[in-house]
Amino acid sequence: MTVIVGRRAKSSECRLVSCNISEACPPFPVPPYPPSEPGVVPCEPPTWAKYVKGVIALMNKNGDVPAFDAVIASCVPLGGGVSSSAALEVATLFFVDQLLGGVSLSRQEKALLCQQAEHRYAGNKCGIMDQFISIMAKEGHALLIDCSQ
């Protein structure tokens, strides 16, 4: 499980701290919605913050995402192939969604937004399974994902 807790910032910059990673993330302005041309959007280190910044930017289409102060905590092992990046993206999406008072996106659209954040900001051309499972899973149930279309 990955969780993000925080509040709207009193400043114009986002401040982000991870309980699990010692590499600090310097304060940063709310990222703008990305340009339409394909390719990886340049993003300042640390690497783990690129996933967060990507989700924020893609949710900032209307320019209404506020700056925030937040803490991230996770029990998902990093770099072990168990979807830690998807967990971080989805936690970010739900955190920003709460800051905005609820965004009208379907669960499928939310998963695709998180996947695009990973493609465009982290430069990782991942599939969609991890994001879909992170958003749509129900305890005690299997989930069929048909990507044949």
Language model features by range: what are they?
Residues 1-86, 90-107, 112-122, 126-129, ...:
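ATP-binding N-lobe of GHMP and related small-molecule kinases
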